[in-house]
A protein has these predicted regions:
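N-terminal intrinsically disordered, low-complexity, charge/repeat-rich segments that act as generic
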Residues: 1-80
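Non-DNA-binding regulatory cores of transcription-related proteins
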Residues: 80-145, 151
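Short coil/turn segments at secondary-structure boundaries
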Residues: 27, 147-148
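Conserved hydrophobic positions within beta-strands
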Residues: 153-157
Length: 157
């Protein structure tokens, strides 16, 4: 599998993960709005139940907005060529872990028939994380230490 094919496979897995998050946020936002509407007419401006539902709706709306912004970045990342240096948009494989330097989405799964388990775990990390700062600007063969653990970069794509 080429570097570009690996890259696309990882990004598509994260897109799927983010789409699921966006769908759940949309469903919860709609549910909170519906519960507020079903509660009846707004007779008291200090109605705590309605206020609670509106706060929940607003919270899920923020999550949906964030997920949609992440999806826009990931769509752009699909168009990028594989990287040689660890920078924003690169996928970095070390001797211990796999990172996608992109959005703060945490751990996600990529199906991989070559892996003994049939899947590999990646971590989508944002530019504000210590790991991102430690790996930024490094190339294949370079090492870095994070939380007292030395890691060597095996691949970047």
């Amino acid at each position: 599998m080429t570097r570009e094919e690996k890259r696309i496979r990882v990004i598509q897995a994260l897109i799927s993960h983010q789409q699921h998050i966006a769908n759940v946020a949309k469903q919860e936002m709609d549910s909170a709005q519906q519960q507020s509407n079903d509660y009846g007419a707004n007779v008291d401006r200090y109605d705590s139940y309605r206020t609670k539902m509106m706060r929940a709706r607003d919270m899920y709306a923020k999550q949906l907005s964030s997920a949609n912004a992440s999806l826009r970045f990931l769509d752009e990342a699909l168009k990028m060529k594989p990287f040689d240096i660890a920078e924003h948009g690169a996928i970095v494989v070390t001797d211990k872990q796999r990172f996608f330097l992109s959005i703060g989405a945490g751990k996600f799964v990529v199906k991989d028939s070559e892996s003994p388990t049939g899947m590999q775990y990646y971590f989508a990390i944002s530019a504000q994380t210590p790991i991102y700062m430690a790996v930024k600007g490094k190339a294949v063969g370079d090492s870095f230490i994070i939380n007292g653990i030395a890691q060597t970069i095996k691949e970047i794509y």
